[in-house]
Amino acid sequence: MKITKVKIEKFSAPLKEPFRVAFGVIEDADSWTVKIETDEGIYGLGSAAPLAFVTGETMDTCYIVMKMFADAFIGFDPMDIAGAHKLMDSIIYSNGAAKCAFDLALYDIIGKKKGLPVYKVLGGTDPVVHNDITIGINAPEKMEADAKEYVFEKGFRILKVKVGNDASLDALRLTSIKKATPAGTVIRVDANQGWTPKQAVRI
């Protein structure tokens, strides 16, 4: 099997409300989608979600790198994951979002070729993904209200709570959410590099 065509398209979705984290505010969910087609009619889909302060990539730079990959992958065997990683690394260092999109699309092709879901291709045994939902930085009462909505109305049992812009206020945010949710609710704390090591230990 050989790769015959690679398509890259932009996807943008406005968020219901601005999403605040320690390093900034995000108002739109922007990403690139890649579709890798093969000579056997099997195709794979992948997605790149670059964020400059996380991956060092912007939407523009990510597209440029993905175009480089797209040209290099024509004629390549999509079943060769190790070779694909070596090829991408030989083209450019880092750029994890762009590489992720192609990695995902190739695994999608492999799964379809083998007639298996990707989690089994990767050696997994549990078909259920236990996901969290993220609560952005806001006033403590707003974050508490969001936590209640996600747990009691939407059924989430794992909350990822963004903090990091004010350590003293962060403690109040986390305490409020902990008190407002039932025992057994998993709370993951993500300060996005906004705390010092001492603050992290103290909180």
Per-segment meaning from a language model:
Residues 33, 106, 111, 173-176:
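Hydrophobic side chains within alpha-helical segments
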Residues 120-203:
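Metal-dependent enolase-superfamily TIM-barrel catalytic cores that perform enediolate-based chemistry
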Residues 29, 60, 64, 79, ...:
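Conserved active-site and cofactor/substrate-binding residues in soluble primary-metabolism enzymes
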